[in-house]
Regions:
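N-terminal Rossmann NAD(P)H-binding glycine-rich loop of SDR-like oxidoreductase domains
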Residues: 2-24
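SDR active-site strand-loop-helix element
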Residues: 5, 29, 78-82, 118-124
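Short glycine-/acidic-enriched loop or helix-start segments at secondary-structure transitions
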Residues: 14-15, 38, 89-90, 129-131
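Short, well-ordered alpha-helices that flank and scaffold nucleotide-derived cofactor binding pockets
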Residues: 17-21, 41, 108-112
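Conserved Rossmann-fold NAD(P)-dependent oxidoreductase catalytic core, especially the SDR/UDP-sugar
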Residues: 25, 92-93, 97-151
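Glycine-rich phosphate-binding loop and adjoining beta1-alpha1-beta2 segment
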Residues: 30-50
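NAD(P)H-binding glycine-rich loop region in Rossmannoid oxidoreductase-like domains
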Residues: 44-98
Length: 151
């Protein structure tokens, strides 16, 4: 079975449609039941409302290890799509808790539960801004661990 974190978000909800169209068995992590309605709308957009009922929903949070451990039961593969996106400096503590500690929790659960494959979905925004002489960021862009976005 595949676990999708961030299943109620933009990428996670579209990923759910794709996985279910491929007849995968999917467990989806959610924090708020009202967000599940948004996922229904994504399935309706693709005319796949019948597939929506095949989702195994589990309430949890990547920052809450006990709820993650419950979510990881009977899982073989994980798509980690959960993250907080904000460019507001006042959100730094919450960004670190969710995006760094939460991701570490997911990775540790993958190790503890013997997960076969983890796919971490992220954003190019995590790499920061290009340097003055660069116009784009690519796989060849130099990674500088001293940059603020690198931790």
């Amino acid at each position: 079975m595949i676990l999708v974190t961030g299943a109620t978000g933009l990428v996670g909800s579209h990923l759910l449609v794709q996985l279910l169209q491929e007849n995968e068995e999917v467990k989806a992590l959610f924090r708020s039941e009202k967000q599940i309605e948004k996922v229904k709308n994504v399935f309706a957009f693709y005319n796949q409302t019948a597939l929506f009922d095949k989702i195994n929903w589990v309430k949890g949070d990547i920052t809450d290890i006990p709820s993650l451990e419950i979510a990881f039961e009977n899982i073989t593969h994980v798509y980690h799509c959960a993250a907080l996106i904000s460019f507001d400096p006042s959100d730094e503590d919450e960004l670190r808790k969710i995006n760094i500690e939460g991701t570490a929790n997911v990775v540790n659960c993958c190790i503890d539960f013997g997960i076969k494959k983890l796919c971490h979905v992220s954003s190019i925004a995590a790499l920061g801004n290009p340097k003055e002489h660069e116009t784009t960021i690519t796989e060849e862009t130099e990674w500088n661990p001293e940059e603020l976005h690198s931790d």
